[in-house]
């Protein structure tokens, strides 16, 4: 695409409030950045209905055994990989359920890979490599809205029958036109013109957090506001798990710890055990009947 088109993008324009930032005192530089960052949450608020649709698509995919697949280049790709990586320890889901793909592969997480984002075919190839199916939801991330790699990925996703969602910071973008559904969060010019690792990336991180978290809540991975499907993989998370069990059941620390051990470190199972006075096997059956929903499991028990 032509450079003249790139220059017309909102994310590439100069920010009038930061034009003299090179002459500012350090504290004043930080105030300028902080003031600009305050506008990001407001921009995200404007697109919440669009984010809601993305959550619905994502939940639909997960319920069918499909996946949420983030794909992007550079900062956008890294954000997708980051969000995907946080889901297994937080919600005890398979690493295959939420996937992050970055143009150029793993080495691009640390260093720029020349030309990795410049070809639509590369986006298609990387989705083919993960055996994309029509049960999946693909979220293509590109602040500019014009990255060929992401454009190719979304075109292929749509052709395959997967849900194709674009996430960008410019309106009426190429990737939005290629998608089934678009989220265009317009944060305005960056403090450093074109440096979309700043406000644009912050907005995208917020939205990716929302999509994955809301999807997991709807999949029964959260009870009240507690991380009841946390994967107990270290001492800190074990302490958190025990505290969650205590909070929900009102039992003392020692009882909660024993239940966690008897449930093979499954927080939900431990909670059901203590709430119903049943053993781990019976608690697991209740959770199976309720598709992992604690409230429904307890309701089934009370009616039995």
Curated annotation (Swiss-Prot):
First-tier enzyme category under EC: lyase
Pfam families membership: GKRP-like_C, GKRP_SIS_N
Domain SIS: 58-221
Positions of region (Disordered): 1-20
GO molecular function: carbohydrate derivative binding; carbon-oxygen lyase activity; ether hydrolase activity
Keyword NADP: no
Subunit structure: Homodimer.
Family: Belongs to the GCKR-like family. MurNAc-6-P etherase subfamily.
Biological function: Specifically catalyzes the cleavage of the D-lactyl ether substituent of MurNAc 6-phosphate, producing GlcNAc 6-phosphate and D-lactate.
Family annotation (PANTHER family): GLUCOKINASE REGULATORY PROTEIN
Miscellaneous comment in the UniProt entry for this protein: A lyase-type mechanism (elimination/hydration) is suggested for the cleavage of the lactyl ether bond of MurNAc 6-phosphate, with the formation of an alpha,beta-unsaturated aldehyde intermediate with (E)-stereochemistry, followed by the syn addition of water to give product.
Name recorded for this polypeptide: N-acetylmuramic acid 6-phosphate etherase 1
């Amino acid at each position: 695409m032509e450079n003249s088109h790139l220059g017309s993008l909102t994310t590439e324009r100069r920010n009038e409030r930061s034009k003299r930032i090179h002459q500012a005192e350090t504290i004043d530089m930080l105030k300028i950045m902080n003031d600009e960052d305050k506008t990001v949450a407001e921009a995200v608020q404007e697109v919440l209905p669009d984010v809601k649709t993305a959550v619905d698509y994502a939940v639909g995919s997960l319920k069918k055994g499909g996946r949420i697949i983030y794909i992007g280049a550079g900062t956008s790709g890294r954000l997708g990989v980051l969000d995907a990586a946080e889901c297994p320890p937080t919600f005890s889901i398979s690493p295959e359920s939420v996937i992050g793909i970055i143009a150029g592969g793993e080495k691009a997480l640390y260093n720029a890979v020349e030309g990795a984002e410049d070809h639509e075919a590369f986006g298609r190839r990387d989705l083919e490599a993960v055996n994309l199916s029509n049960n999946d939801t693909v979220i293509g991330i590109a602040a500019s809205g014009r990255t060929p790699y992401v454009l190719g990925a979304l075109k292929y996703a749509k052709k395959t029958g997967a849900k194709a969602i674009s996430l960008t910071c410019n309106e009426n973008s190429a990737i939005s036109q290629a998608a089934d559904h678009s989220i265009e969060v317009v944060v305005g010019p960056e403090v450093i013109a074109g440096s979309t690792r700043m406000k644009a990336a912050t907005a995208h991180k917020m939205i990716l957090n929302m999509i994955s978290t809301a999807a997991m809540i709807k999949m029964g991975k959260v009870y009240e506001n507690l991380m009841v499907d946390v994967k107990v993989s270290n001492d800190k998370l074990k302490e958190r798990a025990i505290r969650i069990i205590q909070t929900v059941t009102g039992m003392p620390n020692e009882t909660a710890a024993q239940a966690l051990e008897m449930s093979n470190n499954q927080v939900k199972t431990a909670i059901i055990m203590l709430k119903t006075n049943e053993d781990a096997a019976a608690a697991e059956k209740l959770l199976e009947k309720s598709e992992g929903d604690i409230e429904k499991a307890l309701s089934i028990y009370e009616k039995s």
